[in-house]
From Swiss-Prot:
<keyword id="KW-0067">ATP-binding</keyword>
<feature type="binding site">
    <location>
        <position position="190"/>
    </location>
    <ligand>
        <name>substrate</name>
    </ligand>
</feature>
<keyword id="KW-0244">Early protein</keyword>
<dbReference type="GO" id="GO:0006230">
    <property type="term" value="P:TMP biosynthetic process"/>
</dbReference>
<feature type="binding site">
    <location>
        <position position="64"/>
    </location>
    <ligand>
        <name>substrate</name>
    </ligand>
</feature>
<keyword id="KW-0237">DNA synthesis</keyword>
<dbReference type="InterPro" id="IPR027417">
    <property type="entry name" value="P-loop_NTPase"/>
</dbReference>
<feature type="active site" description="Proton acceptor">
    <location>
        <position position="46"/>
    </location>
</feature>
<comment type="subunit">
    <text>Homodimer.</text>
</comment>
<feature type="binding site">
    <location>
        <position position="88"/>
    </location>
    <ligand>
        <name>substrate</name>
    </ligand>
</feature>
<dbReference type="GO" id="GO:0004797">
    <property type="term" value="F:thymidine kinase activity"/>
</dbReference>
<keyword id="KW-0547">Nucleotide-binding</keyword>
<keyword id="KW-0808">Transferase</keyword>
<dbReference type="GO" id="GO:0005524">
    <property type="term" value="F:ATP binding"/>
</dbReference>
<feature type="binding site">
    <location>
        <position position="184"/>
    </location>
    <ligand>
        <name>ATP</name>
    </ligand>
</feature>
<dbReference type="Pfam" id="PF00693">
    <property type="entry name" value="Herpes_TK"/>
</dbReference>
<feature type="binding site">
    <location>
        <begin position="17"/>
        <end position="24"/>
    </location>
    <ligand>
        <name>ATP</name>
    </ligand>
</feature>
Amino acid sequence: MSGTAGTSRILRVYLDGPHGVGKSTTAEALVARCEPRRPIRSMLQEPMAYWRSTFASDAITEIYDTQHRLDSNEITAAEAGAFMTSLQLHMGTPYALLEEAMRPHVGRELAEPDDNGPLPQRRDFVLVVDRHAVASMVCYPLARFMMGCVSLRSVASLISHLPPPLPGTNLVVASLDFREHAARLRARARPGERLDLTMMAAIRNAYAMLANTSRYLLSGGDWRRDWGSLPVFKPSAFVARAAKTAYTLPLRDEPGLADTLFAALKVPEFLDARGYPRAAHAWTLDILANRIRALRVYTLDLTGPPEACAAAFRRLCAGLVLTEGSHPGALCELKRAAAAYAREMSVVGSREPTTAEVESA
């Protein structure tokens, strides 16, 4: 589908994945090499100011402390789950707000990734966002559920509040070898973080399941059709395996339902006597399927130095789907939203469009 003459062409890319794989460094390296000319490229870092200093407490530190207190038997699983659910909702809020700020200004998709013809080349604005709401609302809660830190009730509640993706939402899931991933986490040593290899294994599996879920759904997969073939998920078995091995669920070209996020969501408390989900849980699973199906999910291996990873990221971006602005002033409004997000939610400067760039849009 080609754009209308004169409409703005916008590329939005969300670089996501387990913490510590190097996604932020890769995105920053990509944007740093760009000259300040059209297309304007803006990098929105994780909203650390919102998470760590906007309110009275530091959410990052609270998350690690809660997990540590649970592991030390200082609090119960129910208490930890209540804390974690609140914190995950807080972590996802900036992304949900950004989506709603952009929603009126994002129009139709200009090309499908599987088009036979060339993708549109002109890009007026390239927006790279460090993470997407799916991280805080799906992947991290699910990883903590697999570790026994939050209940499926909490996971279901968060999934049900995942915002509908905007057209042209390109989600790039970064990955890395397990040992290199652990080494990078040890090296970065962010304030408040605790190295937890079991949690690292859980979040790696959650993101692999996310990528497999997208492939499963886009190839015609139907969770209702395949539900009967799934075994009941046992978090304790997952934790025992993750604690002993560096196993990560493989990314599959033709995944089955057992390779997807749905595999961790079949637990007895939400099933009827036949083993099928009760209505409310089924609706939650439908929301998950609809949200993930609407995303354009890609994977990117970040093995190697930042410059090489940035080059691989650039090559991937060349084939991603674009959208057009929904009205003549859309490009200016999107730049303003990006600038406000960077200014108020990031600790250090994401590259904001300058005043001159915004006014010239």
